[in-house]
């Protein structure tokens, strides 16, 4: 913890002791100052009592604590002499030691052992004496500015620093709010769209329910009107029925009975006519079905006859072709059986006419060329 809160300016031990000797007054003077502290404003006293034992390193390095800046202004206005005197001492020390920034810029020595102890003593002194703490802080800031000439000097005005810090914070907050608002807006839009869709669906559902209710009401009204009409018809028919049921004279009763008989006869006649019509319709249907069946049978028979005729014609043609083939085959056979010389001799041999008184040699008759020999009878197929 002590190393984290040490001062950022690191100097050799000899220079550090000289600076401490010049900056810190003697112990007796410090004790006198502690015994008789200068009166401070209420704000400085409150903040001095509330200052912690260990000051954060960030505020020590940058010197941008807003509360300290305000206190520095108030305390600096009330005690300008002390502040100016200390600044002059620092400037004199820097003029006497011109080699310090070169050494510091060239190589920063590593912190030695007594540094944590010195840091704790300084923190203890700063916590006890707020005036010394503020003055030392200002001196350290001026030393840092002179020792690090390349470093950008931070604004010493606490109001400007606070303004910039507030601007940065406001910008960061604005960016964070914008980033947070974008998903929130998208979610809100989605929710709004979902609500609109739900409302539209509810409206449609309500419209459908209203339409169904209207249809039901309309149907109910129609049914009621029909029932009313039937009721009126019954009411209109009821006087006639009442007249019929009332006690009447003999003539009226006979007329009434005659009318009833006529009605019954007409009903019976109508029923008989309907039955007769139904029977005629059934008979006509049977006739039509029978005619259709007969027609189908005739068509089937005609088709069968045609097929048989075709088959018989085909068989007759085949037989005729077979006979022609057989005849041709027999002629070829005869031609092959007769030798060629005999056929020529038969053609050249003269015919002798017998003379009366001469004995004629009986020779078997030979068939002339081209005549067909009688083949053994073959069974003939019956012609169709």
Curated annotation (Swiss-Prot):
Main location: cytoplasm
Subcellular location as annotated: Cytoplasm
Gene Ontology BP terms: keratinization
Domain of life: Eukaryota
UniProt keyword annotations, A-Z: Cytoplasm, Keratinization, Repeat
Pfam families, alphabetized: Involucrin2, Involucrin_N
Composition bias, Low complexity: 137-146, 239-267
Gene Ontology, cellular component aspect: cornified envelope; cytoplasm
Annotated segments matching region Disordered: 1-384
InterPro entries for this protein: Involucrin2 (IPR009733), Involucrin_CS (IPR019743), Involucrin_N (IPR019571)
Basic and acidic residues composition bias: residue spans: 56-65, 80-134, 179-208, 268-308, 315-336
Tissue: Keratinocytes of epidermis and other stratified squamous epithelia.
UniProt entry tagged with the keyword Cytoplasm: yes
Free-text description of this protein's post-translational modifications in UniProt: Substrate of transglutaminase. Specific glutamines or lysines are cross-linked to keratins, desmoplakin and to inter involucrin molecules.
Function: Part of the insoluble cornified cell envelope (CE) of stratified squamous epithelia.
Family classification: Belongs to the involucrin family.
Subunit-structure text: Directly or indirectly cross-linked to cornifelin (CNFN).
Protein name according to UniProt: Involucrin
Record organism: Otolemur crassicaudatus (Brown greater galago)
Gene name in the database record: IVL
